[in-house]
């Protein structure tokens, strides 16, 4: 704000944009109680993620008004929901464990969290940006475990049941749920080696079939948005509308967790700011 004051920036808070027009090389923005004009206009209103903070799709409407293409927006970095076929796992709400979550060629080793609606946690949020409706995701519940670790468990704890063996890798409630699905209900010593090999393979790529996401309400960012093909990669200026710029989450750029989306917003804003 100090820098804004030095640059004699005028802030208009609590104002709605009623109309934007462009004529004779200048933009005309109609607000609730005034009209602002200028040679440049920066679209910096973000995407529709987290609407309770006031987020809308205004950036896309404005971009389309000026002939810019918009890639269909969708929630990203968002929890996934599970259907009735996987209700057993929805009962694990609150259980978290380290996993490798995969979708196609994307793999993330971080924590996964079971919720009353499905799956969340960093690993799931990351993979959600790559997930498309109808696709499965795979979860490795024993990341880093050496091949044959269940056979080793059979040697080291022969009288144990499968839930106890799985409980050395994941929380007890999750171990019980996984064991129920695998359905090997005898002591490890009485299980054929191949059954344990098969169980280990299943645990390394457990399929889940999300039936959706928790939507823009829970999405940290938005995938899709103003097509980058229509913008200068150096200045963020629209190639077909001199003086019009687009930055931040309203543009079709999506980063991983860890501050990358903030960095994109700041970097793209600075790029545009050099030329406004």
Spans of features found by a protein language model:
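N-terminal Rossmann-like dinucleotide/flavin-binding domain of flavoprotein oxidoreductases
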Residues: 1-10
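Short loop/edge segments at beta-strand edges and connector loops
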Residues: 11-15, 31, 72-74, 214
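A glycine-rich dinucleotide-binding beta-alpha-beta segment and adjacent secondary-structure elements
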Residues: 13, 177-254
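A conserved short coil-to-beta-strand element within the FAD-binding core of flavoproteins
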Residues: 13-26
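Short hydrophobic core segments
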Residues: 17, 35-55, 63-64, 112-117, ...
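A conserved FAD-binding loop/helix module that cradles the flavin
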Residues: 47-66, 253-276
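Glycine-rich phosphate/pyrophosphate-binding beta-alpha loops
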Residues: 50-51, 79-80, 115, 119-122, ...
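An anion/pyrophosphate-binding glycine-rich loop and adjacent beta-alpha core
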Residues: 68-74, 78-194
């Amino acid at each position: 704000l100090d820098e804004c004051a030095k640059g004699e920036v005028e802030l208009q808070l609590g104002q709605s944009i009623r109309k934007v027009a462009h004529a004779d090389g200048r933009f005309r923005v109609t607000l609730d109680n005034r009209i602002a004009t200028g040679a440049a206009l920066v679209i910096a209103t973000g995407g529709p993620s987290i609407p309770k903070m006031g987020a809308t799709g205004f950036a896309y409407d404005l971009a389309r008004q000026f002939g810019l293409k918009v890639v269909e927006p969708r929630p990203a970095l968002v929890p996934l929901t599970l259907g009735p076929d996987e209700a057993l796992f929805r009962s694990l709400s609150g259980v978290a464990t380290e996993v490798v979550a995969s979708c196609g060629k994307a793999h993330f080793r971080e924590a996964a969290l079971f919720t009353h609606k499905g799956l969340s946690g960093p690993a799931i949020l990351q993979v959600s940006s790559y997930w498309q409706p109808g696709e499965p995701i795979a979860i490795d519940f024993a990341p880093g475990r050496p091949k044959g670790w269940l056979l080793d468990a059979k040697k080291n704890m022969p009288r144990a049941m499968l839930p106890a063996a799985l409980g050395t890798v994941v929380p007890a409630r999750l171990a019980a749920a996984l064991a129920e699905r695998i359905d090997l209900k005898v002591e490890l010593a009485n299980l054929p080696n191949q059954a344990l090999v098969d169980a280990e393979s299943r645990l390394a790529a457990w399929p889940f079939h999300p039936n959706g996401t928790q939507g823009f309400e829970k999405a940290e960012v938005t995938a899709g948005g103003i097509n980058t093909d229509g913008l200068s990669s150096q200045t963020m200026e629209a190639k077909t509308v001199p003086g019009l710029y687009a930055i931040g989450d309203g543009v079709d750029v999506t980063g991983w967790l860890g501050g990358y989306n903030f960095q994109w917003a700041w970097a793209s804003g600075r790029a545009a700011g050099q030329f406004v």
